Amino acid sequence: MHIKSIILEGFKSYAQRTEVNGFDPLFNAITGLNGSGKSNILDSICFLLGISNLSQVRASNLQDLVYKNGQAGITKASVSITFDNSDKKQSPLGFEVHDEITVTRQVVIGGRNKYLINGVNANNTRVQDLFCSVGLNVNNPHFLIMQGRITKVLNMKPPEILSMIEEAAGTRMYEYKKIAAQKTIEKKEAKLKEIKTILEEEITPTIQKLKEERSSYLEYQKVMREIEHLSRLYIAYQFLLAEDTKVRSAEELKEMQDKVIKLQEELSENDKKIKALNHEIEELEKRKDKETGGILRSLEDALAEAQRVNTKSQSAFDLKKKNLACEESKRKELEKNMVEDSKTLAAKEKEVKKITDGLHALQEASNKDAEALAAAQQHFNAVSAGLSSNEDGAEATLAGQMMACKNDISKAQTEAKQAQMKLKHAQQELKNKQAEVKKMDSGYRKDQEALEAVKRLKEKLEAEMKKLNYEENKEESLLEKRRQLSRDIGRLKETYEALLARFPNLRFAYKDPEKNWNRNCVKGLVASLISVKDTSATTALELVAGERLYNVVVDTEVTGKKLLERGELKRRYTIIPLNKISARCIAPETLRVAQNLVGPDNVHVALSLVEYKPELQKAMEFVFGTTFVCDNMDNAKKVAFDKRIMTRTVTLGGDVFDPHGTLSGGARSQAASILTKFQELKDVQDELRIKENELRALEEELAGLKNTAEKYRQLKQQWEMKTEEADLLQTKLQQSSYHKQQEELDALKKTIEESEETLKNTKEIQRKAEEKYEVLENKMKNAEAERERELKDAQKKLDCAKTKADASSKKMKEKQQEVEAITLELEELKREHTSYKQQLEAVNEAIKSYESQIEVMAAEVAKNKESVNKAQEEVTKQKEVITAQDTVIKAKYAEVAKHKEQNNDSQLKIKELDHNISKHKREAEDGAAKVSKMLKDYDWINAERHLFGQPNSAYDFKTNNPKEAGQRLQKLQEMKEKLGRNVNMRAMNVLTEAEERYNDLMKKKRIVENDKSKILTTIEDLDQKKNQALNIAWQKVNKDFGSIFSTLLPGANAMLAPPEGQTVLDGLEFKVALGNTWKENLTELSGGQRSLVALSLILSMLLFKPAPIYILDEVDAALDLSHTQNIGQMLRTHFTHSQFIVVSLKEGMFNNANVLFKTKFVDGVSTVARFTQCQNGKISKEAKSKAKPPKGAHVEV
């Protein structure tokens, strides 16, 4: 791409429209007197290219570029340059279709700057992209050498010369970005220090302080809760003591008064007894001789009656047992019959299914035969109407069928001719192409072999990846799962601690009493070792266990002793050693009696309502084995007070019935059940253990997956590289001429095969159509006979179809009857099976009834036997009484003496009780006053009075010793006052905020550190590439530098070398040789020689990265004529592919140019004249002889 013409209008000294045409594609020169406007042409080119530093075009702002700053009536400056774009290799991106590109830039005073490309408005960026794509970046212009550039190069130090090489090699931009990146790293480093300082000096101490304050706050809350709990407990205890004193004093007062009355009654009773005894003694004396044994006879009669009743009940009992055995035998027979019927029923169902399937098959066959009959009837009707059947079964006339055959023959012949022509053409083309493609291109073969090798390597990599058995994204999913598990574990721990904080009694912790302590020896609290089968029984089970729920189960008494002595237990615990505990359990006989009494579903042993490990059997029997649990109060009362049971019983609602004299009940506390909370705690603990095990397993899996993941990533990266390489090779093969020829050959071969197949098919179609036509033609000749034959065939087919349809219909109806019969049999079997079930249920009910009756009768038989035994004993006793009557009379005298002595004792006791009655009256009055005062001071006593002293309640005085609670309360009040002075109530919320800020800063810190690591790695990698590119650039520039300098100064040589003791990367300096003598520095050279050195370096760098256009502005100003002449020759010889526009005042320079432009300043405006020069530098005669050169030679305005 090169400049063809420039149009200037209102630009600097070019007031009028000035066209500068006919630029030479290679060497152009501009000359003229100072101030004539020759440099303004260069300024116009820079202006159009979009220069941003206006000082380089000798202007301070865009208004300075307008002719006389717009004060001469011209308010617009416009520059338009036409570029030759016929060489498409150097064409800008996107402009390959244009042979010429015209770019215009306009600036209007007080208006805006405007660009046009080929007459169309364009923005600054698009113009910059256009010129930058061909190496014409005017804001970094290596193609532009202005006045003073040579002096600047001569004064450069080694690092500055190196920077020019870097600029030429394109690595300078990297250095700028590297410095920017290093500054970014320094900023990030400062940010890291800031984050670290904030973490160390602010957040971490704050978090530590807040954690301590949180601990204090939690301790303060714990103390407050305990004070509240213990205060109520202690006050409740004091209230109970006062109330107990009041009640006890009143009860004891009443009891003593009753005792006085009782003693007085006993005195009176004893007097009566003494009189009665005296009377009995008299009677006994009288009856001693009269009694002859009448009582004995009555007792013997009673014995006989008891024996008769016993025999009768025993007979009835034996009869019921026989009936039960009979029913059980009947049940076995029914069960046997049911099993046999089930087998028969299953066999019959299979048979029904089989016959039903056969019926379906017959129905399908019957339907098909019916359809065939309809088709035969239709065919008969068509033949009767004079129609005939074609090959498709459709009815048509013979003439119509013959016409269709003719069409088929004609179509087949046409297709055959087309296929023959296509085949002939393809065969000829194939022959020609095969002659052209005789051997495979060696480059194609190499690429094909390379592609195969890459594919094999890909397959090998895929096999290795598959062998690793690694799933992509598995590591990320595992990491996400680990984060989720960590969050779940944290949540569960918080829930666990919250439950323990809410219910401190659930916490059981101890210190190992000795080294290598086996924690399996301590089983834990009873409440933690059980699971309640039915949650509705929790209240009852809590009352059954009472304070034993908090007992600690251990394996041996030795373990318990060590735990108590050195376990540092936080509170008092009762120990249950499994090897020593003496457990009792309700006998199975007692349980059966209770179940018979109220029903088996209404009473249970408490032990049966909980689940536990077998090794804890003794401990659980100790806690739950001696109490019944009933569903309601009525059943509980029956069970507890039955003389055969007499066992403590608890209802599901919480009422307790104790046959030894205790009955408790009423409203229960609405607080959460301890066992329910224990179960909730266990569930949380189990889930926490599962999550921790999962996390541990996940950590192990991640550790094992790390190496595999890394190896997989490496193999995947190699595989992707090979895939890209294979795609490139495949594309290259497909774009090669050999591949295209092969594709054409394959297409021709395919065409030949298709044509041959078409020919074969058309011949077959034509043959069949001709044969059919011949048959139809014969039919037409014998139409009447043919019609008769077809009519007979149709009648025959119709009769055959009708016979077949009737037969299949008959078979289907027979099969339907068979199915209906066997279905009825199946239904009968099902009814019999149902009947057996009902009979079996009735037998089971009878057996159950007999068993219940036998159980009752067994009890009655036992009772009758006991009556017989008692009657026998009475008879025996009576016989003994008669023998011992003398002894009784003596005993009566002794009893009279005893009663008299008791009267004396009672009189003494009455005097003592009178004294105590006075004392208890005073105590009862004091207790009543204290109770009244406490009820007035504490409103909550009335609401919670029913819970005072109740087991498993907040006022359980057995579990919590009130005296110890009072002492503990005093200490807690002191702790509360101490903690209250320093506690921070906002510590919890502030700590959460501080921890979030800490985590956020740590995340930012990790991001910054990762960014820094990546940047440093990239810089290190790019530094190596930069050094390689710099060495290549230095060698190329150095070679051209020496060559150009030798051309400019024959017999001399020059090079760029690093300073002594340094490398190329440290800097470069000039080394010049005149003849065979190398100069130490440039000061030994003349001014002109130094200028040539600098110019040679500039031009050698232009050669390293050639641009389509070069602009030189009086670079020969400091040179003499001989050197100037050499520069011109050098440009002609070294730069044969670029356009040069040179401004010079010396003939030695512009005489070498192919086209010369001369500027003049006429009437305040600049003009331009064009001259074509011969190779010897002389102006053509034609151009000299005319004032105005012909068109194409020069233009003057």
UniProtKB/Swiss-Prot annotation:
Keywords per UniProt: Acetylation, ATP-binding, Cell cycle, Cell division, Chromosome, Coiled coil, Cytoplasm, DNA condensation, Mitosis, Nucleotide-binding, Nucleus
GO molecular function, one term: single-stranded DNA binding
Keyword Cytoplasm: yes
Residues that bind ATP: 32-39
Coiled coil spans: 173-507, 672-926, 963-1031
Gene3D superfamilies assigned: 1.20.1060.20, 3.30.70.1620, P-loop containing nucleotide triphosphate hydrolases
Modified sites of kind N6-acetyllysine: 114, 222, 677, 1158, 1160
CC terms in the record's Gene Ontology section: chromatin; condensed chromosome; condensed nuclear chromosome; condensin complex; cytoplasm; cytosol; extracellular exosome; nuclear chromosome
Alphabetized CDD domains for the sequence: ABC_SMC2_euk (cd03273)
Disulfide bridge map: none
Family annotation (Pfam families): SMC_hinge, SMC_N
Any Gene Ontology biological process: positive regulation of chromosome segregation
Major place of residence: nucleus
Domains (record comment): The SMC hinge domain, which separates the large intramolecular coiled coil regions, allows the heterodimerization with SMC4, forming a V-shaped heterodimer.
Family: Belongs to the SMC family. SMC2 subfamily.
Main function: Central component of the condensin complex, a complex required for conversion of interphase chromatin into mitotic-like condense chromosomes. The condensin complex probably introduces positive supercoils into relaxed DNA in the presence of type I topoisomerases and converts nicked DNA into positive knotted forms in the presence of type II topoisomerases.
PANTHER family: STRUCTURAL MAINTENANCE OF CHROMOSOMES PROTEIN 3 (PTHR43977)
Protein name: Structural maintenance of chromosomes protein 2
Gene: SMC2
